[in-house]
């Protein structure tokens, strides 16, 4: 869970024995993404693993790692990817993001990866997807449907934050 001291909800307790290395690495990447986006003027970070997310976005099938509103007003679902999932899993996640976009819940889904290799692999996997569901109808996964998906490495995001660029 990505938290800051002034967050309204703060975890009640911590059990070190239940924290796995992989989970720690994922949460640290989430922290870096949140900090980089907030340095660019983003605000209102909401963790996807909190009850507040479920209350604010009922019916969303896939919960992203976080939601943030950028300084231009765009609402972005943040997905941090340390390793690749199956193609079928990404299709389900894409369908959920498209449905959330159609419902006006967020405008973009930003995938942030630790390195160029993972970024390139994910872009190639997305390129291999030809059909997705939009409004319960199979549609081509063309430029129009792909434009809401952004791909960045954490270094790209942090460098953009440091330079004030997008």
Range-by-range predicted roles:
Residues 1-29:
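Interdomain/boundary linker segments immediately adjacent to catalytic/signaling cores
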Residues 2, 9-13, 67, 75-77, ...:
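Ordered hydrophobic segments in well-structured contexts
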Residues 21-24, 34-76, 84-89:
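Active-site metal-binding core of divalent-cation-utilizing nuclease and nuclease-like domains
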Residues 28-31, 91-97:
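Well-ordered, non-membrane alpha-helical segments in soluble/globular domains
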Residues 33-41, 97-101, 126-130:
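Hydrophobic, Leu/Ile/Phe/Ala-enriched alpha-helical segments that form helix-helix packing faces
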């Amino acid at each position: 869970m990505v938290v800051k001291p002034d967050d309204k909800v703060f975890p009640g307790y911590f059990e070190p024995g239940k924290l796995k290395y992989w989970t720690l690495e994922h949460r640290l990447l989430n922290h870096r993404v949140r900090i980089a986006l907030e340095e660019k003027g983003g605000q209102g970070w909401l963790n996807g693993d909190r009850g507040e997310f479920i209350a604010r976005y009922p019916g969303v099938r896939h919960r992203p790692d976080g939601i943030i509103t950028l300084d231009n007003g765009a609402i972005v679902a943040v997905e941090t990817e340390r390793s690749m999932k199956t193609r079928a899993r990404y299709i389900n996640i894409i369908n959920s993001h498209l449905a959330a976009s159609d419902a006006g819940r967020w405008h973009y889904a930003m995938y942030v990866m630790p390195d160029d290799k993972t970024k390139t692999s994910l872009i190639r996997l997305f390129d291999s997807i030809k059909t997705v569901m939009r409004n319960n109808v199979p549609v081509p996964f063309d430029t129009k449907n792909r434009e809401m998906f952004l791909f960045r490495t954490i270094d790209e995001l942090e460098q953009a934050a440091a330079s004030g660029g997008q």
